[in-house]
């Protein structure tokens, strides 16, 4: 998407969304604690395998990035039926060239002697910056904290764009719908460029996410190689790199599990167990969530030393991983959260609550207290889309799916995504979906906030 289109969208949304004052406006200039309920997130990850290819983030040399093949230091994991792939990398060019291109290939080979069909159930890919017409790209634009999406995708960065495409059920034109691979050798499913020609600085990135279904077991690998600018490496070149077992250099040796002191999470290069977290956010021992419990929050993408005092680590475990890389999928990047809030008003009068995704400072949050600060001037911790079904629309009626793009900074409350008003004894199921995007820093919290009755008529629908 062009810069001008997104900037126009930003201006439009800033005009058409009624201003919602921050709940931090009345606070002091320094950090403050909000006392409330903070519960572990109900539900769990599924067991779908996800190839997590994120180490190195910055690719500095050709070679195999991640391989499940049995030979040449591969992880020896066959993928059969449903599996996913998450790949996120950056390329900073060559010092001696101004127009080099790094190419990424996804290779696969059947275990047996029969051809295999791979269906792309859904997926997308995006560059940080496009250098040619037709390339899906999403620059890191300075978007406002909240933008309501209409018919045009809103994105800031490739991870944000791909996450939004997955929520919308859209697919980048660079991706096929189905791939058939012959036995006996590795075949390229995809070959995608990371170009830097004409960019200043020489820096570009690509995010790729695929949800796949294989008709029979296959081995899969991701490989990086230089091409002749616009000409990708040949099939023979890809196979030679895979067969030789040449490795692209890794980065960030992780702190061993269970160690004390400073923790280096590192990045993932392995096979992750779990691609979707599904849960119903009801009260313990009940099938509904009493809205009188608000404010109440649940962590999203909680991790080691980032559980916000809930003692819950949502991080997906790894079935196996490359030596010297992360030992768990810290951050759950690419994981979809599909959450249901069965809201209920047991009172004899109308009650209104608001839904928000927030980014408290994990360094000062624990034991039912979330630390925030006014001003929204800290580093960006989350940039990406979220989908909510069941918010109030006209006349308080529940709306269908609404999608928003958020840019949240460290210690930022809200902003509110919308409100839910319930009559006495009324219930409503609200659904929240997000794909945890690349370029975010966990954790965040999903929050149900109380709203004064006099303010319950605000509607963010443009």
Write out the residue ranges for each language-model feature.
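A broadly tuned preference for mixed-charge, low-complexity surface segments
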Residues: 157-178, 249-274, 395-416
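Large eukaryotic, non-enzymatic subunits of multiprotein complexes that serve as scaffolds/tethers
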Residues: 35, 43-48, 105, 128-131, ...
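Bacterial N-terminal signal peptides that target proteins for export
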Residues: 1-8
């Amino acid at each position: 998407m062009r810069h001008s289109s997104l900037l126009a969208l930003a201006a439009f949304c800033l005009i058409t969304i009624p201003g919602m004052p921050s709940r931090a406006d009345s606070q002091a200039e320094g950090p403050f604690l909000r006392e409330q309920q903070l519960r572990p997130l109900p539900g769990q990850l599924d067991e779908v395998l996800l190839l997590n290819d994120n180490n190195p983030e910055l690719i500095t040399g050709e070679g195999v990035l991640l391989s499940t093949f049995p030979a040449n230091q591969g992880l020896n994991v066959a993928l059969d039926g449903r599996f996913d792939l998450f790949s996120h990398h950056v390329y900073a060019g060559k010092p001696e060239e101004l127009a080099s291109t790094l190419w990424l290939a996804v290779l696969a080979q059947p275990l047996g002697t029969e051809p295999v069909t791979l269906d792309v159930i859904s997926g997308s890919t995006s560059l940080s910056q496009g250098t040619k017409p037709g390339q899906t790209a999403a620059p890191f634009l300075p978007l406002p904290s909240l933008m309501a999406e209409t018919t045009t995708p809103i994105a800031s960065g490739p991870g944000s764009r791909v996450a939004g495409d997955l929520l919308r059920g859209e697919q980048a034109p660079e991706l096929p719908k189905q791939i058939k691979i012959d036995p006996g050798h590795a075949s390229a499913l995809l070959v995608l460029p990371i170009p830097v020609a004409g960019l200043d600085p020489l820096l570009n990135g690509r995010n790729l996410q695929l949800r796949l279904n294989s008709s029979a077991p296959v081995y899969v690998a991701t490989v990086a190689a230089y091409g002749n600018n616009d000409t990708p490496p040949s099939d023979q070149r890809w196979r030679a790199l895979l067969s030789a077992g040449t490795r692209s250099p890794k980065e960030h040796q992780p702190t061993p599990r269970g160690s004390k002191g400073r923790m280096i999470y590192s990045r993932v290069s392995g096979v992750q167990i779990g691609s979707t977290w599904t849960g119903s956010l009801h009260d313990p021992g009940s099938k509904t969530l009493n809205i009188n419990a608000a404010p109440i929050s649940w962590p999203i993408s909680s991790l080691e030393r980032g559980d916000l005092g809930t003692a819950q680590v949502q991080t997906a475990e790894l079935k196996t991983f490359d030596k010297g890389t992360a030992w768990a999928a810290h951050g759950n990047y690419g994981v979809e959260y599909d959450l249901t809030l069965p809201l209920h008003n047991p009172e004899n009068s109308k009650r209104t609550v608001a839904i928000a995704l927030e980014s408290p400072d994990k360094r000062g949050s624990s034991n039912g207290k979330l630390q925030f600060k006014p001003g929204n001037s800290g580093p960006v911790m989350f940039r990406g889309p979220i989908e909510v079904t069941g918010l109030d629309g006209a006349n308080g009626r529940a709306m269908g799916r609404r999608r928003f793009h958020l840019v949240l900074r460290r210690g930022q409350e809200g902003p509110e995504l919308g409100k839910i008003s319930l009559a006495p004894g009324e219930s409503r199921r609200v659904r929240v979906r997000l794909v945890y995007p690349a370029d975010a820093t966990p954790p965040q919290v999903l929050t149900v906030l109380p709203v004064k009755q006099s303010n319950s008529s605000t509607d963010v629908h443009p």
